Amino acid sequence: MSFKVNWNSLETEPLTNWTKELLTSALNSGKSPNILASNITIKDLNFGKIAPDFEILEIGELDRDRFRGIFKIDYQGDFHLTLHTKVQANPLNIYYHNSLEKEVCNYSQDEFITPNFLLSNEQFAIPLDLKLSDIKINGIGIIVFSKSKGLTLVFRNDPLDSIKVSSTFDTVQVLANFLQKQIENQIRDLFRETLPTLIHQLSLKYLSLDNNINEIKSKLSQQDSVSMTNNELASSLKLFDDEENEFPLIYSSKNLQKNMQLFKSRETFRLSVPKFKNIVQRTRLDKFTKSYPNLLNSLYANNADLQHRFVNNINHGHNNNSNTSSNGIPIELLVSHDDKQHYDKTDDLLKDISSIQANNFYKYSNKDAPNKPKRRRIKVHKKSKAKQDDNTVKASELQNVDSTFMDSRSISPQETIDTTSTLIESAPMTRNVSTNIKSPTLETMSTGSSSSASSQVIAHPTPKRAYQPADTTVSTTTINKENHIDYIKARNLYQDFIQMSQSPGYYDKVISNGGGIGLGNSGGNYFGFNGNGNGLERTMSASPIKHLNKDKKSINYIDTSKINEKLNQFRLDGGKNSANTNNSSGGKNFRPGFTRNESNGQQGILFEAFNFPSVAPPPPYC
C-alpha cells in the first residue's frame, strides 16, 4: 500500500513559523557546550518542491482507537536549513571552562580559588552560519498509535544516508571536516532519540484536546433533559463540529506561557516579585485593601481636616488600636470628650456617612423603585410621657405606703425572730423590717329602716410586709416577748369567737378529728358558711391538680362579703330577739346577736378587746 503526499500544502507561513519555534526550543534545550557563545536560531527554513516517498509495508493491528504498522520512507529532495550562532574563538577560555567542569563538577565554583587570568577570561565570539542541504534519508520505521498513549515512531536502521554541511569556516579544511562529522552524529541522534520524543509529545497534546472536546460533547448531551432544548444542543454541538468556524477551540500558546510564567515566578525566595496585571498578590494585599473604596476612605475624600486629624492621632499614639484598613471610623470622633481629640464636626460627619450609605444603596438597587433605605433612629434625652406618668404614680404610691406604716423595727444580724411567725423570716444581714397590720375598718351603710343606724363592715386584713423605714433599735428579748404575748391574745380571742359561732359542731368535729384551727385546714370554713349556705362539710377532691400554682387562689383567702352578710343578719335577728330576751333565752333555736353583750360573758370580752361593739376579729396572723 502506498499513497501520495501533497507536499505543496506545507509551504505555508504558519507551519513554517511553528516549525522554527519547535526546532529552536529543541536545539537550545539542555546545557549548551562551552564552545558556543550564544543560542542557536533558525535563519532560513525551506521544505523544497520534492516530496518524500512513503510506503506502508505491513499493518499489524487496526482499530478505531489503535494502529500498528511498518512503513518505509525514502527522501532525496531539496530541503535546506540554515542555522545561526556565535562560537568561542579563545581556546584558553574554552580550556578554562572545560577544566572547571572536570575538576569541580558537583560543587559550587565559589568554594575553590581559581587563577584569574585576563586573557583566559576574555571572550572572543565569532558569528557562524551553518547550512544543511542535500539530505538523503532511507529507512524503515514502526508506527504505533493509541488514543490513550499517543503516537510512537521507532526506526529499525539508521535512516540518514548523507547530508551536506556548509559553513563560514569552509576555507579552513580542518574545521570543515570537524563540523561535518559532528553534525552527522547529531542528526543520527535526532532520528534515533529526539524525533520520536517530539512526535510523541505533540501527539499527546492534540489527543488530549480531542478527548476534552469529546467530554464536553458528552456533558452537553447529558444535560439535554435538564436545562437545554434540542435546538440549543444542536447549535452547541455544531460549534465543535464546524471545521470552518472562525474561533476554533484550541489551546492558546500565549495563555500557556503566561500561566507558566506565573507559576515559575512563585518558585523563588526573592523579595522583588514581578507584578502582573489584574492579579492581586498576597504580599501586596494590605496596599490593595487600603486603596479599596470603603467608608473611611470616602470620608477622607470629603473631609481633608478629618484625614489630617486622624493621621496625626495615629502618629502620636492616640489611636493605636484603630485599623485604618477596616470598613469603619474611629469611635473617638463621635464620643471623645477630650479637648485635644474632640472633633467639632460630628453632625456633618454623620450626614456624610448617611449620604455614602444611601449612594451605595441606590447604586446596587433599582433607582426607580419607591423603596427607601430603612434607618435606625435613636432619640437622645427624650422620655415618653407614659414612662413619666408611671414614675409619678409609683412615687405617690410609695408616699402613701410610708404614711400608713404603723410600726417599724430594725433587726441586726445577731437578732432572731420567733419561728411561730409565718410571714417574717430571719435575715442573714442587717435590714429594716416594717410590721403593718391593717385592722378591720368600719364603713357606714344607710338602710331603709333606719337612716341613723350605722352598720359595720369587715375588710380583709393586710399581712405583714418587709419595708425600709428609719432605723430603730429594739432588743431581741423585747421583740420575742411582744410577739409571744400578741400571739397568745390573738389565739385566745379567735378560739372564743369560734365557740360563740352558730355552728359549734364544726369546731368540735375538727378538734375530735385531730385537725388544727388555722388557715387551709380541711375541716371546713372558719365561720361555718359554705358557698351553698347549708352549713355542710366541704369535701376535698381526690382528683389531681389540673391548674398551675399561679392559677390557684391562696389558701389564706377569706370571703369577707359573705361574713358581712351574716353580720347584717345577726344584727336583724338580735334586734328582734332583744324584746323577748327572757322568753327565748332557754330555747333551742336561740342565736346570740353581736349587739347583746349580756347573752354571753365571753362575747363582751371579744368586742372590748377590739374596741368595736360589733366587729369580728381577724385570724391569727402573728
Swiss-Prot record:
Location of this chain's protein in the cell: Mitochondrion outer membrane
Function: Component of the ERMES/MDM complex, which serves as a molecular tether to connect the endoplasmic reticulum (ER) and mitochondria. Components of this complex are involved in the control of mitochondrial shape and protein biogenesis, and function in nonvesicular lipid trafficking between the ER and mitochondria. MDM34 is required for the interaction of the ER-resident membrane protein MMM1 and the outer mitochondrial membrane-resident beta-barrel protein MDM10.
Full protein name: Mitochondrial distribution and morphology protein 34
Annotated GO CC locations: ERMES complex
Entry's Gene Ontology BP terms: mitochondrial genome maintenance; mitochondrion-endoplasmic reticulum membrane tethering; phospholipid transport
Topology versus the membrane: Multi-pass membrane protein
UniProt keyword annotation of Membrane present: yes
Keyword Repressor listed: no
Biased composition (Low complexity): 446-455
Domain remarks: Lacks alpha-helical transmembrane segments, suggesting that it resides in the membrane via beta-sheet conformations similar to those predicted for other outer membrane proteins and porin.
Molecular function GO terms recorded: lipid binding
Compositionally biased residues, Basic residues: 372-385
InterPro entries: Mdm34 (IPR027536), SMP_LBD (IPR031468)
Taxonomic path: Eukaryota, Fungi, Dikarya, Ascomycota, Saccharomycotina
Region of interest (Disordered), ranges: 364-393, 442-468, 572-592
Family: Belongs to the MDM34 family.
Residue stretches of biased makeup (Polar residues): 577-587
